[in-house]
Amino acid sequence: MAGPQPLALQLEQLLNPRPSEADPEADPEEATAARVIDRFDEGEDGEGDFLVVGSIRKLASASLLDTDKRYCGKTTSRKAWNEDHWEQTLPGSSDEEISDEEGSGDEDSEGLGLEEYDEDDLGAAEEQECGDHRESKKSRSHSAKTPGFSVQSISDFEKFTKGMDDLGSSEEEEDEESGMEEGDDAEDSQGESEEDRAGDRNSEDDGVVMTFSSVKVSEEVEKGRAVKNQIALWDQLLEGRIKLQKALLTTNQLPQPDVFPLFKDKGGPEFSSALKNSHKALKALLRSLVGLQEELLFQYPDTRYLVDGTKPNAGSEEISSEDDELVEEKKQQRRRVPAKRKLEMEDYPSFMAKRFADFTVYRNRTLQKWHDKTKLASGKLGKGFGAFERSILTQIDHILMDKERLLRRTQTKRSVYRVLGKPEPAAQPVPESLPGEPEILPQAPANAHLKDLDEEIFDDDDFYHQLLRELIERKTSSLDPNDQVAMGRQWLAIQKLRSKIHKKVDRKASKGRKLRFHVLSKLLSFMAPIDHTTMNDDARTELYRSLFGQLHPPDEGHGD
């Protein structure tokens, strides 16, 4: 069912003598009829932002014509209508449409003979219209001056129409209504502003969360890169240590002080020149290592005092990034590196001892700091591990107390090599075993390798093998267990390491008491294996003859 009809159309239908035709498809029930309600727009287009009108208020605005008499049409004259039209004309306003409808209604009423009113009635109507027009202008000016209030913001029409059923309402009621409208508008604007603030807070919280997460991710990535670089640096140092192991074994074989003059006398000038060149090379290497140590100590702020001679700052254990940048800038401006001293060979022991004593302060502080961090991360250990509850520095001091035992471990000969100028140890004779009697083997003394001490050597094979074992375990721990090739390589590396540590010596294979044989490899692409054995054809023939009791060739037997 359509909405309320304008006044002109109602008058036209009343004056039309023809009967109206009923639409059979029209819905007689008003409650179930479909309604199309236009947007209620009473203000000018140039004013503030529009407010969203809810469905309940739209229904309330549609029924205003039925409940309030002010929204119904009223009689007026053409002169008054023209004055009102020209004074209130604004582009795009809804008043033009209303005035056009009223004008069309007046023209229709004039054409239908509605000029039967008396002049007195028309004058009274004109005066009343002029008074209403002045009041409307005053109300518009008041609404324009009042900040934060506009006609378009009026949305609560039920409160606006309370107590206004009569046309002759007083100004006090109008003031109260305007106050109620302003209060409603303030509540609506306050509610919207709170929603906007909540949205802004949510957006700010999201921004903070995103920023925090990005910062956290970047920090974790930076830590991962630092750990990766540390592992790569440790691998390079370990590789250098592995290469130095061969040089260490060769150094242990050099002539010792008691026989060195004899080698020097018998070596002649060639031996003396080689000795002089090696002495210069070792001196240059020692200076390079000391220079590298000074460079590394100077680059790190916590160890710079060891090089430039300043006092250590024990309070500052960690330096922030900003302080580190300032230190780098100052270092670029002026780098105070101590003058390099050319030390003699006899000065290096005292210099290195003093450097180590100064470095001990920083070493102990760093060890204690990281020990505390790992202890907090791993939690408190059980009562059974009381030794680990002590400080890391206490444990180190306890181990270093027995220096003689530690020195004996470095002076113990663990590898098989011969020191030049020393006689070879006499081999113990192996007693022959008579037939029918059990074989007698020489009894080796218990822990014989620990009794082979030499004060002129330095042997740390136990520590070296421990480093190799840890390296192999770390390299192979990240392998896929399903990768058979990688597992095979790991097994070969472990077996090679074990063969270096413990050599398998078969004592029963001496003096020809055990047959030695070589297993030939399988055929590959119909190619016979290459014979790497040292036996010639005559030895093989003699071997096969001895197996079957034929010690002499067959032709010799027939000749006899």
From Swiss-Prot:
Residues 373-472 are annotated as: RB1 and SP1 binding. The keyword Cell wall biogenesis/degradation does not apply. Residues 94-129, 168-195 have a biased composition (Acidic residues). Ubiquitously expressed. Expressed at high levels in brain, heart, kidney, placenta and thymus. GO terms for biological process: cell adhesion; embryonic cleavage; negative regulation of amyloid precursor protein biosynthetic process; negative regulation of apoptotic signaling pathway; regulation of mitotic cell cycle; ribosomal small subunit biogenesis. One of its GO terms (molecular function) is leucine zipper domain binding. It is found in: Nucleus, Nucleolus. The modification N-acetylalanine is found at A2. Pfam families: AATF-Che1 (PF13339), TRAUB (PF08164). Its main location: nucleus. The modification Phosphoserine is found at S61, S63, S150, S155, S203, S273, S316, S320, S321. GO terms for cellular component: cytoplasm; nucleolus; nucleoplasm; nucleus; small-subunit processome; transcription regulator complex. Hyperphosphorylated during the G1/S phase transition. Residues 156-165 have a biased composition (Basic and acidic residues). Residues 76-208, 309-333 are annotated as: Disordered. Belongs to the AATF family. Part of the small subunit (SSU) processome, composed of more than 70 proteins and the RNA chaperone small nucleolar RNA (snoRNA) U3. Interacts with POLR2J, RB1/RB, RBL1/P107 and RBL2/P130. Interacts with PAWR and SP1. May also bind MAPT. This is Protein AATF. The lineage of its organism: Eukaryota, Metazoa, Chordata, Craniata, Vertebrata.
